[in-house]
UniProtKB/Swiss-Prot annotation:
pH-activity note: Optimum pH is 6.5.
Subunit comment: Monomer.
Cofactor: Ca(2+)
Pathway: Glycan degradation; starch degradation
Species this protein is from: Bacteroides thetaiotaomicron (strain ATCC 29148 / DSM 2079 / JCM 5827 / CCUG 10774 / NCTC 10582 / VPI-5482 / E50)
Presence of keyword Cell wall biogenesis/degradation: no
Transmembrane residue ranges: none
MF (Gene Ontology): alpha-1,4-glucosidase activity; calcium ion binding; carbohydrate binding; glucan 1,4-alpha-glucosidase activity
UniProt-listed Enzyme Commission number(s): 3.2.1.3
Protein family membership: Belongs to the glycosyl hydrolase 97 family.
Protein name: Glucan 1,4-alpha-glucosidase SusB
GO terms of biological process kind: starch catabolic process
Coiled-coil ranges (or none): none
Length: 738
């Protein structure tokens, strides 16, 4: 790690004439200014401007604690008749005075284990304000970090006699908007992020909420104006604003609730089964609340605030075993309804250890059988893939969902037609790793009971990565997917996996907040509406032009692109869904939807029909030295160029919405004086996601850093370009400049 640090600590004593004075913090480039003060009621307030434009109007900060429990000892007695005194103890939002302020500047460059660039700069100015509340004799710290691309702040609770153990009733962090901005939003929900995005004015959210809430396997929407982070907005005066959080550890996931009369968002935490929102023990802190802002949409995509606000890697040897993975899997045929996760249709109830599958009749549709898996292994080996995922391999799928069943899977017992040892031997001979699947059916207590045994089973049978799932309502019953208890579980699973040198791809878990910096074996997350929904009726055409501005702000997504046969009835006649994308855009998603874990999600037979287009999936890199955001507008288009790790090869991808998009590309990011062979995979002139999704063109030619190229993406279309350095002049023979 390269470091360049400048620390300047300036302590201001709590002198009466400056105690509640206004404090200003500027970004290193002076474009952002954050102003903090305590108002006349002793409430902490802040505001934020960017190039003299208001980003956050004056907004208050603080928390509300739960009333103290009625059960007490003689050592902790409070007079029950003194209700004023009792209620005041729940107040951590006013009655404060400034006790101390400290400022600092920090500048370092660090290297991620994997990522969108080789090095990341972490440069900010900091203000830490210690606030004292005389009526309760307690202190808190609000720490602000102002980067060139945005602001992060969090609450810190020092250990003290008057604040040791406490329960959070609600966090009241406000984000006051300066207008009725355009928002790219999904409904606030304690249990799912798998919604299509709605584009509307803030004032329209209430009226559109009912339509925006579509059915899901587990969902708990909480308000007519509640939305989830990361929330993307665009102002009428040309600012792009993103609200999210970073380093979500031992705390509840934050949503936002909008006061649509005053255009003020306020934090809304996910409750536990009792309705409480956080059990805390000092010293402790909240996650960071983040505000990314720019007058250029590309800078939202380029921001690394979320990663920079997380702690450095805690796995000492991570670089030796955490590696990007390109994989295929026994999955899409089941998603479309052609195949089945379950082994038999005869059982309506399964009891693990008691149900005898040898006495049942196979349904003939079970996809995770040895012969079929070997076929996938052969395909992966022939085309340079790293791994094969197999879902539905283990006993219990016949009654796995919707029964609030505790002991649902044991994660080690295969179905009769899945030979674990033979598949391990076969894959090893072919140089292919197997990817484990741990669907928990949201029975988290059961998963934790079996976790060590399940991870050891993986280690014994050649699995070094796992796709985990949490479909359904959480057990223990009443807990939510995004509450403090579950967030602690997700991190426990990742840390435990690291003990076995296992990489984790968590589905249905809390949306990422940059924790992959600290634990890079968290190599993938779903936490949004992915490709599977294309088989359940389809995603909105603009979906992939929004996700990088929202969900991917927190970390990579296992979006599972690469569907070439977009008509699902070709797989299953009963499924009339259509993937809302052209083939060219499916290729582009390997560049625009960043992840070190990339799946070629279609079945082998569909790739064999389009091997020329499939070549891009085979070629595209997973790990990057450099990323350039060439053009971007949320809801319309995104074009990204990435330089492959330790090479001078580049890959470009463009995804477009319903209006299509024409790019005027300039390749000045290429090395001067070098020639490159470019292979351009583009929509044909008559391509259209609905009418002609498989129409594409492929052309080769020479590029230099002075080249320019116009390319058109169709409705729901895109394009992809592989750009490889010419190392021998003979490689370019016969090719013309593009």
């Amino acid at each position: 790690m390269k470091k360049r640090k400048i620390l300047s600590l300036i302590a201001f004593l709590c002198i009466s004439f400056i105690a509640n004075a206004q404090q200003k913090l500027t970004s290193p480039d002076n474009n952002l200014v954050m102003t903090f003060q305590v108002d006349s009621k002793g409430a902490p307030t802040y505001e934020l401007t960017y190039k003299n434009k208001v980003v956050i109007k004056p907004s208050t900060l603080g928390l509300e604690l739960k009333k103290e429990d009625n059960t007490r000892t003689d050592f902790d007695w409070v007079d029950r008749r003194d209700l004023t005194k009792l209620d005041s103890k729940t107040n951590l939002y006013d009655g404060f005075e400034v006790k101390d302020t400290q400022t600092a500047t920090f500048d370092e460059t660090w290297q991620p284990v994997w990522g969108e660039e080789k090095e990341i700069r972490n440069h900010y100015n900091e203000l830490a304000v210690t606030l004292y509340q005389p009526m309760n004799d307690r202190s808190i710290v609000i720490r602000f970090r102002l980067f060139n691309d945005g602001l992060g702040f969090r609450y810190e609770f020092p250990q003290q006699k008057s604040l040791n153990y406490f329960v959070i009733k609600e966090e009241h962090s406000q984000f006051g908007m300066n207008g009725d901005h355009i928002a790219f939003w999904i409904p606030g929900d304690y249990d799912t992020q798998e919604y299509d995005y709605t584009i509307s004015r803030l004032s329209e959210i209430r009226g559109l909420m009912k339509e925006a809430i579509t059915p899901n396997s587990s969902q708990t929407p909480f308000s007519q104006t509640g939305v989830q982070t990361a929330l993307m907005m665009k102002t009428d005066d040309g600012l792009y604003i993103n609200l999210h959080e970073a380093a979500l550890v031992d705390y509840s996931c934050m949503h936002l609730n909008l006061d649509d009369k005053n255009m003020v968002f306020e934090s809304w935490l996910t409750p536990d089964a009792k309705g409480d929102k956080g059990y805390m023990q000092t010293p402790c802190n909240t996650p960071w609340r983040t505000i990314i802002v720019s007058d250029d949409a590309r800078n939202i995509l380029a921001s690394r605030i979320t990663l920079n606000l997380n702690e450095p890697c805690k796995i000492a040897d991570a670089a030796s075993w955490v590696k990007p993975v390109k994989y295929i899997g026994v999955w899409w045929d089941m998603i479309t309804g052609k195949g089945s996760w379950a082994y038999t249709d005869e059982l309506t109830s399964v009891k693990l250890g008691e149900t005898d599958y040898s006495k049942t009749k196979p349904n003939g549709k079970h996809s995770a059988n040895t012969a079929n898996v070997k076929r996938y292994i052969d395909f992966a080996a022939a085309h340079g893939f790293d791994a094969v995922l197999v879902e539905g391999w283990n006993e219990g799928w016949e009654d796995w969902f919707g029964n609030s069943k505790d002991y649902v899977f044991d994660f080690v017992t295969p179905y009769p037609d899945f030979d674990v040892k033979e598949i391990h031997r076969y894959a090893a001979r072919k140089g292919i790793k197997m990817m484990m699947h741990h669907e928990t059916s949201a029975s988290v207590r059961n998963y934790e009971r079996h976790m060590d045994k399940a991870y050891q089973f993986m280690a014994d049978n050649g699995y070094n990565s796992v796709k985990s799932g949490y479909v359904g309502n959480i057990i223990p019953r009443g807990e939510h997917h995004y509450g403090q208890w579950m967030n602690n579980h997700y991190l426990y699973a990742v840390k435990k996996a690291a003990d076995y040198k296992i990489m984790v791809n968590a589905h249905e878990a809390t949306r990422p907040t940059g924790i992959c910096r600290t634990y890079p074996n968290l190599i993938g997350n779903e936490s949004a509406r992915g490709t599977e929904y294309e088989s359940f009726g389809g995603n909105k055409v603009y979906h992939t032009t929004i996700l990088p501005f929202t969900r991917l702000v927190g970390g990579p997504m296992d979006y599972t692109p690469g569907i070439f046969e977009t008509h699902c009835n070709k797989m299953n006649p009963a499924n009339n869904s259509q993937v809302r994308s052209t083939i060219a855009r499916q290729l582009a998603l390997y560049v625009t939807m960043y992840s070190p874990l990339q799946m070629a999600a279609d079945i082998p037979e569909n790739y064999e029909r389009f091997m020329d287009a499939f070549q891009f999936i085979k070629d595209v890199a997973l790990d990057w030295d450099e990323t350039n955001y060439l053009e971007a507008e949320p809801g319309e288009y995104i074009t990204i160029a990435r330089k492959a790790k330790d090479t001078d090869d580049w890959y470009v991808g463009c995804t477009a919405g319903e209006n299509g998009h024409t790019s005027k590309l300039v390749f000045d990011f290429l090395t001067p004086g070098k020639q490159y062979i470019a292979t351009v995979y583009a929509d044909a002139k008559d391509a259209d996601w609905k009418e002609n999704p498989q129409a594409y063109t492929i052309k080769k030619g020479i590029l230099t850093n002075k080249s320019k190229l116009n390319l058109h993406a169709a409705n729901g279309g895109g394009y992809a370009i592989s750009i490889k350095e010419v190392k021998d002049k003979s490689e370019a023979k016969g090719l013309k400049r593009l």
